[in-house]
Amino acid sequence: MEIFDYDNILLLPRKCRVESRSECDASVELGRQRFRIPVVPANMKTVVDESICVWLAQNSYFYVMHRFDLDNVQFVKNMKARGLYASISLGVKKPDYDTVDQLLALGLVPDYITIDIAHGHADSVKNMIGYLKEKMPTVFIIAGNVATPEAVIDLENWGADATKVGIGPGKVCITKLKTGFGTGGWQLSAVKWCARVATKPIIADGGIHEHGDIAKSIRFGATMVMIGSMLAGHEESPGKSVEVDGKLYKEYYGSASDFNKGEYKHVEGKRILEPVKGKLADTLIEMEQDVQSSISYSGGKRLMDIRKVNYVTLGGDNAGEHLLM
C-alpha cells in the first residue's frame, strides 16, 4: 500500500478540450440533489450555523448542520418552511433516538442525516442506521468517521448511503497525538484505500489545506470533501471574533475540544484563531473556479473526468509516476 498525503502528490495534465475553464461543470450529485461544487463545510459550531445553512441551501451548496446545543427538530421545521432541503447531524445516544421520534411525530423527515461520531466503525452506528432505515426509509444517510476499507464495507452493508472517511487529519484535531490512531499524515491514501472497495459515495473529511486538494480527493475516489479551517474564519462565521495586535481573527475549534464539550473529558480537539478571510460566498466562488480549472487540466469537462488522470508522488520510497492506478 502506498502511503502519501496531499502535499506529496501532483496530478498530471492531459490535453485540454475546452475553450474556457468556465465550460467545465464542477457540480456533483449526492442523494436526490445536485450541488454546485463537491465541497461541504464541516459540521462544526465555528463553521456553520442556521443562517449559513439557509444561505448554502438557497445557493445550491451542500451543508450538514452541526449537532451541538441545537434543537434539530426546530431546525428541520424551519428549513422545510423555507422550502429548502434539511440536512442534520445525529449522534448515537438516547437523545438522538428521541430526536428521530420527535421528528416522526411531527411528520418531519430530513433529506440528509449524518451520523457523526469520532469512531464510526461501531455497533452503535450500525444500530442507528438500522433505526433510521426502519423509521425514515427515504432519508439519505451519511455515516462516519472511518479510516479503513473494512469499515466502509460494513457501513455500506449496514445501510449507509455515503461514508465519511478521515480520523484526525484536520487542523484542530489532535486524535493522533492523544490516541495514536488516525489518518493524519496519510489522509489521501486512506481515501484511495477506502474508495477502492466503496460502492457508494465517499466524503473525504479533513486535511484539506489548498483548493487543489479538492481535485486530488476526487482523483482518488471521493465524491465530496468536507472542509473546516478553510471555511472557518469568514465574516459570517459563527466563531467568536478576537482582535490581536490590531488584526481580526475568528475562533475555530474541534468538535472534540474542551471548548465545544464544555468540559475537559475525552478531549481530541483544540482551539485556534483563524484570520478573517472576508465573505464566505467569495471563497466558495473561488473554489468553484479552481475546481473548473482542475477539470480543464484533466482534459475533461465534468468533475469525474479528474479520476482519469495520472499522478506523480514527490519524494519517499514511492516517488515516481503512476499510471491510472
From Swiss-Prot:
- Which PROSITE patterns does this one have? IMP_DH_GMP_RED
SUPFAM superfamilies listed in its UniProt record: Inosine monophosphate dehydrogenase (IMPDH)
Residue numbers annotated as active site: C173
Q: Where does NADP(+) bind?
A: 202-225
Q: List the catalysed reactions.
A: IMP + NH4(+) + NADP(+) = GMP + NADPH + 2 H(+)
Job of this protein: Catalyzes the irreversible NADPH-dependent deamination of GMP to IMP. It functions in the conversion of nucleobase, nucleoside and nucleotide derivatives of G to A nucleotides, and in maintaining the intracellular balance of A and G nucleotides.
Stated name of the protein: GMP reductase
Q: What is the lineage of its organism?
A: Bacteria, Pseudomonadati, Pseudomonadota, Betaproteobacteria, Burkholderiales
